[in-house]
Regions:
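Ubiquitin-like/PB1-type beta-grasp interaction modules and other compact soluble beta-rich domains
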Residues: 1-80
Length: 81
């Protein structure tokens, strides 16, 4: 199955693009997308454990199952005042 990946802020800078697409086996989870992105872009690895996950525009947990055509977003922590 194919899913669209959206990357924000520092994650976008690491990858060099705000979006990507990945192919995964049926039954894959949001976490599997993150693992695939790390394999493609190893500089994403230090962000593990600090990012938020969204599936089809709603925050979700990393174990959420995916379907073909889903949109997964990875968001780094936000700071500021």
């Amino acid at each position: 199955m194919k899913v669209k990946v959206l990357l924000f802020a520092s994650l976008r800078e690491v990858v060099g693009s705000s979006q990507s697409a990945v192919e995964l086996e049926p039954g894959a989870s949001v976490e599997d997308v993150w693992t695939r992105m790390i394999s493609l872009y190893p500089r994403l690895a230090p962000h593990t454990g600090t990012i938020a996950f969204a599936l089809n525009s709603a925050f979700t947990n990393p174990h959420e199952a995916l379907h073909d055509g889903d949109e997964v977003a990875f968001l780094p922590p936000v700071s500021g005042g």
